[in-house]
Regions:
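Sequence-specific dsDNA recognition surfaces
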Residues: 1-2, 16-50
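A short glycine-rich beta-alpha junction/loop motif
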Residues: 7, 73-79, 89, 101, ...
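Cleft-lining beta-strand/loop regions that shape enzyme active-site pockets
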Residues: 13
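Short, ligand-facing micro-motifs at secondary-structure edges
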Residues: 19-31, 50-76, 92-96, 105-109
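Amphipathic alpha-helical segments
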Residues: 94, 128-167
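A cross-family detector of function-defining hotspots
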Residues: 170
């Protein structure tokens, strides 16, 4: 999109949104863009869509993935690949699955490049992963989300204790 269209309008999912969020929700998408006719049809994302980082300066980061967990309209940019559901899956579980060491290894080998590494839809479509039944996906996703929430709480407590310690020392 033209640079003048940025800063207002429809939320625009960039690579930074994929990398810097546990999950992508409408309210944590940083950028906005004025959309043209047909942009929503072509680049729109729906709840549960998987978004991949198309290119990276390091092979280890190519194909990093996240999921959109909102129903509000948003679009994705050119350095992002959108994956649509071919079947039934739990988006929460899938986010964790795609970040697992096994999935990362299988995605990384599909990347190509010398100084800048890329992966395309064709490469991603050839990645094979073992996926449990929907009931198990739901349980695993919820458990991992609970663990992440607990880790975040503990990290906040640690930060607060560090601040308290500094205040006492000063």
């Amino acid at each position: 999109p033209d640079a003048k269209r940025f800063g207002r309008g429809t939320k625009f999912i960039s690579v930074m949104d994929i990398l810097n969020n546990q999950f992508i929700c409408y309210d944590n998408i940083r950028a906005s863009v004025e959309v043209m006719d047909g942009d929503i049809d072509t680049y729109g994302v729906n709840y549960g869509d998987i978004l991949f980082q198309r290119s990276s300066e390091t092979l280890e980061d190519v194909g990093q993935a996240n999921v959109y967990l909102d129903s509000k309209p948003a679009i994705f940019g050119g350095f992002v690949i959108r994956g649509k559901s071919k079947g039934n899956y739990n988006p929460l579980f899938f986010r964790y699955l795609l970040a697992s060491p096994t999935a990362r290894k299988r995605i990384i080998v599909k990347g190509a490049g010398a100084q800048h590494f890329n992966i395309g839809q064709d490469g991603l479509s050839k990645v094979s992963l073992d996926i449990p039944c929907m009931q198990e996906q739901k349980k695993i996703g919820e458990l991992l989300q609970c663990i992440d929430a607990r880790i975040a709480t503990q990290n906040k407590i640690i930060e607060d204790l560090k601040k308290l310690k500094c205040a006492i020392i000063e």
